Amino acid sequence: MAAAVELTGDGGTTAETRWLSPPLTHDDNRGFLQMLREKKERLGVGAAKVEVRLEKLTVEADVRVGRRAVPTLLNCAINAAQELAACAHMCTTRKKPMKIINEATGTIRPSRMTLLLGAPGSGKTTLLKALAGKLDSSLKMKGKVTYNGEEVNSSTPQYLHAYVSQYDLHHAEMTVRETIDFSSKMLGTNNEFEMLGEAIRRKKGVINRVDQELDSFIKATTFGEGSNLTTNYIIKILGLSECADTLVGDEMRRGISGGQKKRATIGEMLVGLARCFFMDDISTGLDSSTTFEIMKFLQQMAHLMDLTMVISLLQPPPETLELFDDIILLCEGQIVYHGPRENATDFFETMGFKCPSRKNVADFLQEVTSKMDQKQYWIGNANKYQYHSIEKFAESFRTSYLPRLVENDHFESTNAGKSKEVKTSTSRMISSWNIFKACFSREVLLLKRNSPVHIFKTIQITVLALVISTLFLRTNMRHDTVLDANKYMGALFMAVVIVNFNGMTEIAMTIKRLPIFYKQREILALPGWALLSSVFLLSLPISFVETGLWTGLTYYVIGYAPSFVRFIQHFVVLFAMHQMSMSLYRFLAAIGRTQVMANMLGTAALIAIYILGGFVISKDNLQPWLRWGYWTSPFTYAQNAVALNEFLDDRWATEFHFANANTVGETILKVRGLLTEWHWYWICVSILFGFSLVFNILSIFALQYMRSPHKHQVNINATKVKVDYNSQIVGNGTASTDQVILPFQPLSLVFDHINYFVDMPKEMTKYGVTDKKLQLLQDVSGAFRPGVLTALMGITGAGKTTLLDVLAGRKTGGYIEGTVKIAGYPKKQETFSRISGYCEQSDIHSPNLTVYESLQFSAWLRLPSNVKSHQRNMFIDEVMDLVELTGLKNAMVGLAGATGLSAEQRKRLTIAVELVASPSIIFMDEPTTGLDARAAAIVMRTVRKTVDTGRTVVCTIHQPSIEIFESFDELLLMKRGGQLIYSGSLGPLSSNMIKYFEAIPGVPRIKEGQNPAAWMLDISSRTAEYEIGVDYAEIYQRSSLYWENRQLIDDLGKPEPNTEDLHFPPKYWQDFRAQCMACLWKQNCAYWKNSEHNVVRFINTFAVSIMFGIVFWKIGSTIKDEQDVFNILGVVYGSALFLGFMNCSILQPVVGMERVVLYREKAAGMYSTMAYAIAQVAVELPYMFVQVFIFSAIVYPMIGFQMTATKFFWFALYMVLSFLYYTLYGMMTVALTPNIEIAAGLSFLIFIFWNVFSGFIIGRQMIPVWWRWVYWANPAAWTVYGLMFSQLGDRTELIQVPGQPEQTVKEFLEGYLGLQDRYFNLVTSLHVAIIALFTFLFFLSIKHLKFQRR
């Protein structure tokens, strides 16, 4: 459907209707849907209503509980061993079954809107996914879900049901309109519209003007012009018109707000107009008025289009609750109530629990089953009260009249309902061609929007081409001897290597988009082949440009065979290699699925195809039983093809007899173990294209069938599995008898005439805006006092968070005017961070710590040094009890939205992290967002108790219930544009605030029982202000309230007599040594539990070590000719470069993730960044030493180096130094760059330089003088030098060199490779120097560079 200023499709059809003209009101929408319904009835068109039934639905998961669930390295090893033993039927896995949904039975009727209520962790998401047929395959499901009697399964038509996730995953590069439009194309046209369209085609004559408008709309929607029309309608009803053409954005791109992203997530599925909708916590991030608007539109659609809707909301306000027809109350997986909304309170009243008159019914329903809250609603004799368990409620419901009431009142009789079977409509099925077109057009769009990435790659390959072409410049390139051919061989190999490396960027690009693909695969049925084929087709011109650029810049400059045919054939090989490379790394990303795993697989694959490709060690020197590996490496075919193309040219036909060859060209091919016949060129090229085809096919299967690696999961306690009701009483907020009282100083905060500006966005100039600055806060003044809880409220865009950031000193940009005083003295940020806490909305924590460890770390560094450790631990326990985290003490924090704590648990942890610092002033940004009513009440009780201790607390809050709103003492209300419109006390039952606004002429009076917060936000909206014809900011500045506040500001802005300004002698509570110890303790805890990172690198090190040992088996024991030296040089080269680079690449995501936490902790004044940096470096050392031990212990004896203590020591030492500088280099690049993608790109670019100038591809003696300085600036070259000379520098065996007399190994090293004894000590010293330099740069950049923008 469509509704906008103009409902215009791609084909130019326009349907401007009087009932869809902007703005789209509820009456407009109802009128449109009503006329559409009447039209269907006249034409006899209509889709079957869908009744959804649950029949004893049980969903179970096998989980590990207790400490064994914590993913430490030891637990991972034990768990893996148990899994293997269980597979061999030697033991059980010791997992425990946990029921997520327990025998849920019920009927969800069509043409009605059902509200699903329940606390986070109650099983709401699992139930909704079960209803939508989207359950994860790892879960065990019993019972069944049916649509009109037919069981839901994978063959159920996609258009029948839609699941809206609670997580907002979108392409940052697409606009809101493009995002919803793509979903529309993938979901297809609504079946009813198809039938209507067919009826209209057959209809003769025109009934009236309204029919004409409906007909034109339906035709446009049905016959290929309707995607924009459908999209526009959804955009309109969701209130997204203002941002429809704005990029969604992410942490790197400015985009829409969190609330707008949530609405885009809803629109993404709503646009398909399925028959059943299952929506999961869709009000998170939305204010109450926006939530009401959206729910009202959804109600009209459910009633007038006969849809079946089940929607879960966290904190539905009363006016929103009244829009629902039915309620399902889910507690710990059991349905406690399912029936009409109006009967819900009656049911609980029959059990002795009554909802108070001013209590939100939704809040009552969620609290009445809680052991902590239940007693307050008991209406019987207080002495006879006993806790009613969830099982008792559920059993009472099952035996009540309500289930039978629902059964008797469903939409049709059972027989009639079953006759309307749900059948797949072939006309609704989207053709493969249309799916491909939609995907391809989106990929073209993303390619354009990501053009900076491809421009960067083009610049990168241009720079590398210029380097390589000047390194192998034709004026220095001869073609008379085998040594000359060796130099050309190095240039050819380098071309293959760089083209292959260029394809590695596919890993990061693919990993970045996989979470969105998994979501769209699940909810849009996006097939893997559609995405992969689109990406593949668009990769062809990319390969053409990049390999064409490389070939054009290097071929004739280096001086390869001058024939144009040879030039084209050289290009074809590199093009095929580039395609193979992109396909390979795309495939590895698809099976790795996480950045760490994909980087590991990519590096392992690179090492394997590199080592087995025939250049590092020739085919003839491989063990006979390993030569099959040579033919499995794509490098083999690329290297053979480019070598054949070059060395079979006539200019290499100089007569030369060696190794059964007659020319120089044939000799180099024979010596290198390469093919010598021309027909192999085309075979090799064909095989490269074959590799590409195979990897693309495998990628399709991986995308289609592999599960998402981060399915949302929460921590499971053993108590939950046993359903221990006593666990619910933990954390009831009551003070313990041995309460620890930590001293703090009550402080007031005054801010006067605060103005905040940012530079005007460039996009605004397009609309004629000439101002250079955009003002976000306008002359805001106020005061926050000890013992007073203040609410900072306003509609979206009013500047609430901006004001908090300015007052807390968290803004990193913009221009601030005005004064801020603490206890009458000007605010100093250094001291303010010591006495304040800031609970950010984003809940940023280290994912690999437990809850208790997170609190220990915060308290360790933020409490005064004179607080003893036992006092600190007791205080932490009290805070955990206060915010109900005691039961989650040993739970992993995890990644937000993926693993670990749920959203509300993370929110409580955020508050606890600040409370353990015992601050005097606390700022809280949206502390109840994402929480259900009960969790929000717990949080606000915690806040209230904090205020009652004499602290100053300010909260921004979105959509508070009556109870939560009236727990505040004072209110600061702002309107859009950053202007203050009310500042003062709320009064009993919000009477002061209500009295103030009702005194303004034109303001509608509050309705009886209406939430004062919702009423206040409604009347203060821009639309309401315009309709009334007032400016609230002007009215406030003329009011007596304003002058009362001015007097308060003046009074609090003066210091109290006999007081001094805050002063803390040291900059931090703890000294530098304690900071280092605390940071190292935290990093050690996090690393020990980061099993993915550490297990991956240990396994990879072991696998690579075994591969090196097998491939280079005993090559160091005997040296007979030049090729034997090159083979040893190959293993040294591989040891010096690849494992170190693997460490660098898999470390970067870990450091990048912790850097975000660093910004929060640094802003809180917890520690010096130097302490953080030292801990980050130090924690890597033991894990790195283990890697070096594994590698050295395996590789050294297997490759046959001389077994002397001295030589083994030098080998191990250089490996330690190599690992160390690679590790530090990875950290340094993260600290120097704003994100991991740029850090990875920079690392790759530098790694190529290190690779080229390492002394393997071209020896130091052969490097042109203008590039020789790079060799001496290259740490990888030093490692190759040190390893090679320490092992072979004293070898005196005579070896054969083609075209030269016999010479000793030492003479060959000095003459050809430039390895001399006099430089050995220098090389060792340079290792220490580069490690010190990288460490210094890491410390410096982490201290002074901050890429967070607020």
Curated annotation (Swiss-Prot):
> What residues does the ABC transporter domain cover?
85-357, 749-1001
Q: What is its main location?
A: membrane
UniProt keyword terms in alphabetical order: ATP-binding, Membrane, Nucleotide-binding, Repeat, Transmembrane, Transmembrane helix, Transport
Q: Which residues cross the membrane?
A: 453-473, 491-511, 523-543, 557-577, 597-617, 683-703, 1099-1119, 1126-1146, 1181-1201, 1208-1228, 1238-1258, 1269-1289, 1322-1342
Q: What is the lineage of its organism?
A: Eukaryota, Viridiplantae, Streptophyta, Embryophyta, Tracheophyta
> Which CDD domains did the record assign?
ABCG_PDR_domain2
Q: Which residues bind ATP 2?
A: G794, I795, T796, G797, A798, G799, K800, T801
Q: Where is this region: Disordered?
A: 1-23
Looking at the record, the residues that make up the ABC transmembrane type-2 domain are: 434-647, 1074-1288
**Pfam families, alphabetically?**
ABC2_membrane, ABC2_membrane_7, ABC_tran, PDR_assoc
Q: Which GO terms describe its molecular function?
A: ABC-type transporter activity; ATP binding; ATP hydrolysis activity
Where does it sit, as one GO cellular component term? membrane
Key word Membrane present: yes
Q: Does the keyword Nucleotide-binding apply?
A: yes
| Designated name of the protein | ABC transporter G family member 45
Q: What does this protein do?
A: May be a general defense protein.
Q: Where in or outside the cell?
A: Membrane
